[in-house]
Amino acid sequence: MKTLDLTKYGRQNVSFYLALERHILNAPEWRNDELFFIWDINPAIVCGKHQLIESEVNMDYVRKIGVPIYRRHSGGGTIFADEGCFMFTFIKRTGKRDDVFRECLSSVVDAFHEIARKYYSNEFQGNFEIVSLTGTIN
């Protein structure tokens, strides 16, 4: 799996990453590639493709605070990605969905465990959890 280094683009709006995903999925030059990249995003609300935005989002409040709303290509719920939040994309061309999730997310979990062990081992007492929300394009 290839990793795309997008740091040269800096923090972007969600639309940049959604367009990049769509381009990679449809462009002939990427047809056989399996890719991973991290999104460094500006604050936004991101809704899954099947969500009713008006049911998920307090529209009056969102307009008041000026946070943009985006609809992603994949399913899943609605999230608020605040300052410092990052998202990630895995693009795999083959395999059963559950196997792909297990394989890809296990590497993310391993990375978080390493970060926690390296940087936070003396900061926390007790248990803590890291949660990942995922979606897929069928």
Predicted regions, residues:
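Short, contiguous, pocket-lining structural segments
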Residues: Q12, F80, K96, V100
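Short secondary-structure junctions
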Residues: L6-T7, I69, R117-Y120
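Conserved active-site and cofactor/substrate-binding residues in soluble primary-metabolism enzymes
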Residues: S15, A19, K64, D99, ...
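A glycine-rich, hydrophobic loop/mini-helix early in the fold
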Residues: D60-K92
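Catalytic beta-strand/loop module used to bind and position nucleotide/cofactor moieties
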Residues: F86-N138
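Active-site loop/lid in soluble adenylation, ligation, and acyl-transfer enzymes
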Residues: M1-E56, D60, R72
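Short hydrophobic-aromatic micro-motifs
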Residues: I45-G48, F80, N138
